[in-house]
Amino acid sequence: DELAGIPGRINLLNAQLIECVPVNFVRGLTFNDSIVIVDEAQNLTKSELVTILTRFGANSKFVVIGDSNQSDINGKSGFGPIYNCFNNKSSEREGIFTFKFTGKDIVRSEILKFIVKKLEGV
């Protein structure tokens, strides 16, 4: 809603240019000619992430976004292991890239930079 506003989001959904699919409903799908954004991936189990990633079809891009420090599924997150699995040169040769943001990348607010830095040591 920040980028397109609510009317813009509704128009994109109605035009079927974007689609929101809960993880429970991706089984059996193949994402061809798509850009798939998986947000809050730290709250998905390894099994759920595997289910999503194995829907990868032709001419598609997947963007998986997560913060291991913000998982709320009590140690069951699959995000860290999946990230580490693809954080290497062989994955890069296949066109799979990973990166991490640091505290310097925070743009939400200056106070948040301070808070995140303090929380790193907790």
Q: PLM features: residue spans?
A:
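Conserved helicase motor core of SF1/SF2 NTP-dependent helicases
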Residues: 1-38, 42-122
